[in-house]
Amino acid sequence: MKVNNQWIRGIWSDDGGKTVCFPDQTKLPYQLEICREGTSDALIRAIKTMQVRGAPLIGAAGAWAAAFLCREAKTEEALQKGLKRIAEARPTAVNLQWAVRRVASAAEGLSGDVRAARAQKAAEEICESDIESNRAIGGYFASVIEETYRKNGRPVRILTHCNAGWLATVDYGTALSGLYVAQEQGIPMEVWVDETRPRMQGLLTEWELREAGIPCTLIADNAGGYLMQQGEVDLVIVGADRIASNGDVANKVGTYLKALAANDCGVPFYVAAPVSTVDFSLAEGVESIPVEERSRSEVTEISGIGPDGNVTRVQVAGQDTAVRNIAFDITPARLITGCL
């Protein structure tokens, strides 16, 4: 997508595939800083620290990590150990495991430069496929937005949780791709953006939409239910980190509560995700999808702009405060209007 008149993707290759570049999402929306990495270890670290985040983008970064590993590994044992480390960097987003398997399969039985070239091609194909999938998802959801607009005759009011835009993918996004396509079609919209504690990914969504010229309003996480009760939400659209075979959806913690409120208020609730997010090995998700728990500091500290204009972190809870930082929750399929 365009930022400051410059076209930027969630991740892209450079130097003939020797390195990849990506915006450091731990610095956004305060600073746009582009990272350049060329080793599997560096990309594993970027995935773990959420410099890259969002299930499809984690998958793409994992694909490049696997491709770099195919170039680096001197033995089959080192290759297999490295692939396992990449796949386990984040446990909930199934796209990561899927992408690693696909690159490993493309390079299986090969060695040296041939293996490296085949792995790089697989990583490139995964990235291009992600863009195509997201554009298709955008077309589907744009038709839902258009239908709602024609029915109501006013700007469509959409609520979204976390960030499922181009920052969470290679480009366009999943949940937000429909908004971008609808904007191209001239359909008026107003977007409610959940702040999405504790990592405040809603700030990324607000930044994305503002850069794209789509009207949006940042709200506290717990405000969505009230807005639905008051008839101020026409549609809810979210992304997904893993979808079980029965349609249960793992997504950023808080998604389940939005789905419950939408169900109670009769507001359509949609999930947007590529096929790589579906885990066909799981019959259901509520009891089976592994849910990541992250550092207590994500809850007890928060980033912002200090009086000197620089990004700073402040503590909002004491060191003796008991904390449990659950990163995802599972929304049962019965609460979901449709998966796009």
Annotated model-derived regions:
Residues 188-189, 194-340:
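Conserved phosphate- and dinucleotide-binding cores of soluble alpha/beta proteins
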Residues 95-157, 189, 193-236:
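Ligand-binding beta-strand-loop-alpha-helix segment within the catalytic cores
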Residues 149, 154-176:
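Helix-rich catalytic cores of soluble enzyme domains
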Residues 172-184, 259:
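Histidine-anchored nucleotide/phosphate-binding helix
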Residues 35-51, 156-160, 309-325:
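Short, hydrophobic/aliphatic alpha-helical segments
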Residues 23, 61, 65, 97, ...:
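Short beta-strand segments
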Residues 2, 9-113:
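Long amphipathic alpha-helical segments
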Residues 49-62, 96, 163-171, 324-340:
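Conserved phosphate/anionic-ligand binding catalytic regions in large, soluble enzymes, centered on
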